[in-house]
Amino acid sequence: MSRIAKYPVELPKGVEANIQQDQITVKGPLGTLSQALTGDVTVALDNGKLTFVAANESRHAGAMSGTVRALVANMVTGVSKGFERKLTLVGVGYRAQVQGDAVKLQLGFSHDIVHKLPAGVKAECPTQTEIVIKGSNKQVVGQVAAELRAYREPEPYKGKGVRYADERVVIKETKKK
């Protein structure tokens, strides 16, 4: 059995979980999220706690019980507190601004990049060189941040590009003659 699945997931105040045959739905103040369940994992709700047990003794069932527990724990956190990812733009003339449900980036190309945000994800720009992506689904928030970073990844000689706020870019030394 997975060591992660041993610990139950507690539902905070204002969060409800609904378990069907092959799906779990978590509803909270920041929205509703659903996750498909495999037949290898049995989920039970009692006294505001979700418990996860492998349905059989196979190695795959034990691994999946930990995976499902981690995904559901992220869902509970997402609908109660939410997730955010911060990006920083480093470079001369690099700017970002939010236009409705899209982020407009100026990253040194001959054209501006307009990245449309998926449903359930919001972005804000506290300054011209910072982007904060917020949402209830951790996977979607991380995916949007990765897509924005992919437009201009930090280059290793000057460090210019779009980077995560907590990312450290190792600067290489240039060639000497």
UniProtKB/Swiss-Prot annotation:
GO terms for cellular component: cytosolic large ribosomal subunit. Pfam families: Ribosomal_L6. SUPFAM superfamilies: Ribosomal protein L6. Belongs to the universal ribosomal protein uL6 family. This protein binds to the 23S rRNA, and is important in its secondary structure. It is located near the subunit interface in the base of the L7/L12 stalk, and near the tRNA binding site of the peptidyltransferase center. InterPro entries: Ribosomal_uL6-like, Ribosomal_uL6-like_a/b-dom_sf, Ribosomal_uL6_a/b-dom, Ribosomal_uL6_bac-type, Ribosomal_uL6_CS. GO terms for molecular function: rRNA binding; structural constituent of ribosome. GO terms for biological process: cytoplasmic translation. This is Large ribosomal subunit protein uL6. It comes from the Bacteria. Keywords: Ribonucleoprotein, Ribosomal protein, RNA-binding, rRNA-binding. Part of the 50S ribosomal subunit. The keyword Glycosyltransferase does not apply.
